[in-house]
Regions:
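DPxDG-like acidic metal-binding loop motif
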Residues: 65-98
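Oxyanion-binding and handling regions
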Residues: 1-30, 36-44, 58, 97-186
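Short amphipathic alpha-helical face segments that pack within enzyme cores
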Residues: 44-47, 83, 87, 104
């Protein structure tokens, strides 16, 4: 029997949510799971990933790669997500790539198309912001990521998405890029 590694795993823990996704390369099958991260979320991450894989009958040796959110976002959240992805990648001998959390937020919020701003609180009246347009399964970055005063966004066109979880499918789809996971703390 020949083992086919056809699944890509996406992980994001940079925001108040823990987002997981599985994407099948050939069949375009997608599964998502998002839950509040909360206290102790980092300790639950690896068991959550194992349960997520099991719930969808995907064995670890069927993973072809892992994509992980690199922020901007929570320092502890970023560290736990990236460390878990790197540990799993090393154990399974699969590539691990990083992609932006703001991009993953825009990808999910703009699922039906259109354009808008993904925002994360940068504190002190500032926001991490990215303006994007969704075209099919692609995301076209119009501006950003930038960190700006919130007041600067008041005159910008487009809907703002701030309290939405990142769509980890974005990270899964980018799992086979050659971008190493370098955190963007903000």
């Amino acid at each position: 029997m020949t083992l086919v590694r056809a699944w890509l795993l996406g992980i994001d823990t940079a925001t108040p949510w823990r987002s997981l996704a599985l994407w099948h390369i050939a069949d375009d099958v997608v599964w998502r799971d998002t839950a509040p991260l909360g206290r102790g979320g980092a300790a639950r991450l690896v068991p959550d990933v194992a349960a997520f894989l099991s719930a969808h009958d995907v064995r670890r040796d069927e993973l072809a790669g892992i994509g992980v959110g690199v922020g901007p976002g929570s320092y502890t959240g970023l560290r736990s997500g990236i460390a878990a992805a790197l540990g799993l990648g090393r154990a399974l001998q699969v590539p691990v790539a990083g992609s932006g959390t703001l991009e993953a937020m825009a990808f999910g919020a703009l699922e039906r198309g259109g354009s808008g701003w993904a925002l994360l609180d940068a504190r002190r009246g500032r926001a991490h912001a990215l303006q994007a347009e969704r075209v099919g399964t692609r995301l076209r970055i119009l501006r950003g990521p930038v960190t700006v005063p919130r007041s600067a966004l008041a005159d910008e066109a487009g809907e703002c998405f701030e309290h939405v979880p990142p769509d980890a499918v974005w990270h899964a789809r980018n799992a086979l890029t050659s971008t190493p996971p370098q955190p963007r703390y903000g």
